[in-house]
Curated annotation (Swiss-Prot):
Alphabetical keyword list: Cytoplasm, Gluconeogenesis, Glycolysis, Isomerase
Catalysed transformations (reactions): alpha-D-glucose 6-phosphate = beta-D-fructose 6-phosphate
Name of the protein in question: Glucose-6-phosphate isomerase
E.C. designation(s): 5.3.1.9
GO biological process: gluconeogenesis; glucose 6-phosphate metabolic process; glycolytic process
GO cellular component, one term: cytosol
Pathway(s) served: Carbohydrate biosynthesis; gluconeogenesis; Carbohydrate degradation; glycolysis; D-glyceraldehyde 3-phosphate and glycerone phosphate from D-glucose: step 2/4
Name of the gene encoding the protein in the UniProt record: pgi
Native source species: Methylobacillus flagellatus (strain ATCC 51484 / DSM 6875 / VKM B-1610 / KT)
A Pfam entry, by short name: PGI
Length: 555
């Protein structure tokens, strides 16, 4: 399928959209007492409720036909088989091999990659155990208390999110910090909380040349040497996740403490690899492998479940329905678990870097809208920030709610007061978004409060909620490493399915590279005395304003 909008099934969906558009979900629930039963799925220890969507019995069969006509199943099998489906970079897409707990062979260019995967996992286990046990000592003989991961993009967002989510599994007395931004404030404020004698730095850069990461790493090294003095001590406090042994050695890191990963692992899918070393140290390798197990179980589900019972496929198709037919341009990620506070930011990269494309696989301009804007916040914080827009704004914003049935923490009356309030709010929001509040209902409510006459008529229209706002809800028992692995893998595969239907390459990121190319040219010019004239008038003006303000003041 080169252009999905030209296909008969796309036209069928467009016609069906016109039929569904005037329908109200609250009426659908009233007419069909089995709606939840029909449009929910319990699988892999999760409940997926997609009944609060603007769909009828005819919608999903049409969407499943779209998936089959787009050859989603064939592309899925090609990915798992190690074919180089990332054709613009001539790379396989095999983050799934990193969590292949069956250990069955996975081939790239005729070579089974599983021995290398297992070798690095064993290296991670040995090293992380030595840190956690105190066997590994810093230069002064003290055990490590703080681990600072220096990376950016996929080398940061995944580990940050996972460590935050799985904090209940962390070892007491061992802290994880993450530095990504080239803004020196990020590193400086992190180092303020660390002691050079007890801090380990993980420098995560495949090439060991990434500008932001290596600038931060060099500054961290200088900070460390102000206390340690002897450069030989660097080897006890710095390790690398890289493939560039020469540059790692020049930095002062022992080659034995270089952890490898491969070009068939995309950055935004790399937390499953050695990039997850900070996770393994923080929560322990056993729990890290439970994370892998969760991802693997969803891989099996994605590969083997029919499309009609396939969680990532259903979520992907609902996204297509709203993105391409209803014109929704964003998706709100709303985790009702404070541990998942960074999950929306993680999914921003996973989704927007993957499917933010306007060129199809055949090099032509895509004729339909592709990746949505991903945003969100942990509940209930978001309720007091942006839910107003979702409820009463004039944009359609589909929402993904996710919620554990049990908390890790016992708080409040009977030990579950806080969690019950959280659950009640989550369920209430999905209900309110779906059913809304009619003019008559709002009027009855105001009359019951004693309002009459002009006061009632003035306030009444502002109390109406249109409803018909779609949402998906994912419930799970508890936020464990395995459950988190499942959630991440579900969204990975959802993103993949959407990219196939849109006929784009979800695995390159040339948009990230372009700005960096220009920045490399601009950087030395910021220190030159002469005015900048090379760029457009705006960019020249910004650069020259910087020069006038800093050079004249001597800074």
């Amino acid at each position: 399928m080169t252009n999905p909008t030209n296909c008969p099934i796309w036209h069928d969906l467009s016609a069906h959209y016109q039929e569904v558009l005037p329908l109200q979900m609250r009426d659908m629930f009233t007419k069909d007492g089995r709606r939840f039963e029909k449009f929910s799925l319990e699988a892999e220890g999760l409940l997926l409720d997609y009944s609060k969507h603007r769909i009828t019995d005819e919608t999903l069969p049409l969407l499943f036909k779209l998936a089959r006509d787009s050859k989603v199943e064939e592309w899925r099998d090609r990915m798992f088989a190690g074919e180089k489906i990332n054709f613009t970079e001539n790379r396989a897409v095999l983050h799934t091999a990193l969590r292949n707990r069956s250990n069955t062979p996975v081939y790239v260019d005729g070579k089974d990659v599983m021995p290398d995967v297992n070798r690095v996992l064993a290296q991670m286990r040995k090293f992380s155990t030595s840190i956690r046990s105190g066997e590994w000592k810093g230069y002064s003989g003290k055990r490590i208390t703080d681990v600072v991961n220096i990376g950016i993009g996929g080398s940061d967002l995944g580990p940050v999110m996972v460590c935050g989510a799985l904090k209940p599994y962390a070892q007491a007395g061992l802290n994880a910090h993450f530095v990504s931004n080239i803004d020196g404030t990020h590193l400086a404020q992190t180092l303020e909380r660390c002691d050079p004698e007890t801090t380990l730095f993980i420098v995560a850069s495949k090439t060991f040349t990434t500008q932001e990461t290596m600038t931060n790493a060099r500054s961290a090294r200088s900070w460390f040497l102000q206390a340690a003095k002897d450069e030989a001590h660097v080897a006890k406090h710095f390790v690398a996740i890289s493939t560039n042994a020469d540059e790692v050695g020049k930095f002062g890191i022992d080659a034995a403490n270089m952890f490898e990963f491969w070009d068939w692992v995309g950055g935004r899918y790399s937390l499953w690899s050695a990039i997850g070393l900070s996770i393994a140290i923080y929560i322990g390798m056993d729990h890290f492998e439970e994370l892998l197990q969760g991802g693997y179980e969803i891989d099996r589900h994605f590969k083997n479940a029919p499309l009609e019972q396939n969680i990532p496929v259903i979520m992907a198709l609902l996204g297509i329905w709203y993105n391409n037919f209803f014109g929704a341009d964003s998706l709100a990620i709303l985790p009702y678990d404070q541990g998942l506070a960074r999950f929306p930011a993680y999914l921003q990269q996973a989704d927007m870097e993957s499917n933010g494309k306007f060129v199809a696989r055949d090099g032509r301009i895509v004729q339909c809208t592709t990746g949505p804007i991903i945003w969100g916040e942990a509940g209930t914080n978001g309720q007091h920030a942006f839910y107003q827009l979702i409820h009463q704004g004039n944009r359609l914003i589909p929402c993904d709610f996710m919620m554990p049935l049990q908390s890790h923490y016992s708080m409040g009356k009977n030990g579950n007061e806080h969690h019950l309030i959280l659950l009640a709010n989550c369920f209430a929001q999905t209900s309110a978004l779906m059913q809304g509040k009619t003019l008559d209902e709002a009027k009855a409510e105001l009359v019951a409060q004693g309002l009459t006459g002009e006061a009632l008529e003035t306030l009444l229209p502002h109390k109406v909620f249109e409803g018909n706002r779609p949402s998906t809800t994912i419930l799970f028992d508890k936020l464990t490493p395995k459950t988190l692995g499942k959630l991440i893998a579900i969204y990975e595969h959802k993103i993949f399915v959407q990219g196939i239907i849109w006929n784009i390459n979800s695995f390159d990121q040339w948009g990230v590279e372009y700005g960096k190319q220009i920045a490399k040219k601009i950087l030395p010019q910021l220190s030159e005395d002469q005015a900048s004239t090379e760029y457009d008038s705006s960019t020249n003006g910004l650069m020259n304003y910087f020069k006038s303000r800093t050079q004249s003041s001597g800074t």
